[in-house]
């Protein structure tokens, strides 16, 4: 219920932001166009954002005979929830995420690198963590916030170009360069804050929930240490291309030295591991 309310607030905020920008660009006509655009975007964010994210990462569905599907199925039955669809991302960087608007329409995606680097027990710990996100209904707000963060970044880029090429000396049309500069600075910060505020506390709850589902918190603790090390050693190219989706993953896939990772979307791995080890 709380996450549904958060989703409504995020969609309403996106609508308000677009309407304000539409007013700045085109007056009352711009506001109407922006309102229509926001309605389409909100509809798409709710119904299709999960499909879009899976396509971003070229995720392919796994068959019901794959051992990962069997693990997910067993965990779901143990937790008393619907069995999510399972997808595989062909990338050597080990990571995973869950998406979907509700438990009945959820999906879990893992990379080939995760299957190559982790033991079956560690894989079970990761899958239980992602299933906990599904049960807690984090997946809808996570994927909607990714859409909003991406939209904010796109709007910032639009203002940058308009401020550079759309302004004339009489200020009769176009966007004033100062407005463009403000949007260029504020919008990415707002996007980062949205992601950080939503995901950090939810990761702790999913860690604890996943540990209870799997029955062994040490499996996830061990997996997190391996995933953290691997993600510092190599780039996840698709994630670098789509930084607004970083908070979906169990471990932040972005390069820590980049400005795109100025705001941490995840708690520290050390703190997460310490909490898991203290559970039992």
From Swiss-Prot:
Taxonomic superkingdom: Bacteria
Keyword entries, A-Z: Cell inner membrane, Cell membrane, Hydrolase, Membrane, Metal-binding, Metalloprotease, Protease, Stress response, Transmembrane, Transmembrane helix, Zinc
Free-text cofactor note: Binds 1 zinc ion per subunit.
BP terms from Gene Ontology: proteolysis
Residues spanning the membrane: 7-26, 30-49, 146-166, 178-198
Record-listed E.C. numbers: 3.4.24.-
InterPro entries found in the cross-reference section: HtpX_protease, Pept_M48_protease_HtpX, Peptidase_M48
Alphabetized Gene3D superfamilies for the sequence: Metalloproteases ('zincins'), catalytic domain
Entry's localization field: Cell inner membrane
UniProt: Zn(2+) binding residues: 129, 133, 203
Recorded topology in the membrane: Multi-pass membrane protein
Residues of the signal peptide: none
Cofactor requirements of the protein: Zn(2+)
Annotated disulfide bonds: none
Active-site residues from the entry: 130
A molecular function (GO) term: metalloendopeptidase activity
GO cellular component terms attached to this protein's record: plasma membrane
UniProt family annotation: Belongs to the peptidase M48B family.
Protein name: Protease HtpX
Organism for this UniProt entry: Legionella pneumophila (strain Corby)
UniProt lineage: Bacteria, Pseudomonadati, Pseudomonadota, Gammaproteobacteria, Legionellales
